[in-house]
Amino acid sequence: MAFLRSFLGAKQIIRRESSSTPRGFMAVYVGENDQKKKRYVVPVSYLNQPLFQQLLSKSEEEFGYDHPMGGLTIPCHESLFFTVTSQIQ
């Protein structure tokens, strides 16, 4: 069951190299410390989810409102990001 939830959650997260972001989605950069950040596109509805808001709080603690990537940067390991986003459904 967890695999199915993870698979369905992965359909909502889009890894995009291009700078375009579809309507109703937002770009976030995910990665820890000096590791290269990867860009993902997630639904804006995630902003209302308590689990995602915990990631945003971690981002605010580390960066304040000045994000070095120019977009929203979430300072966590990719596996944690996928775990959190797979639980939002």
UniProtKB/Swiss-Prot annotation:
Keywords: Auxin signaling pathway, Cell membrane, Developmental protein, Growth regulation, Membrane. Pfam families: Auxin_inducible (PF02519). It is found in: Cell membrane. InterPro entries: SAUR_fam. Functions as a positive effector of cell expansion through modulation of auxin transport. Belongs to the ARG7 family. This is Auxin-responsive protein SAUR15. The gene is SAUR15.
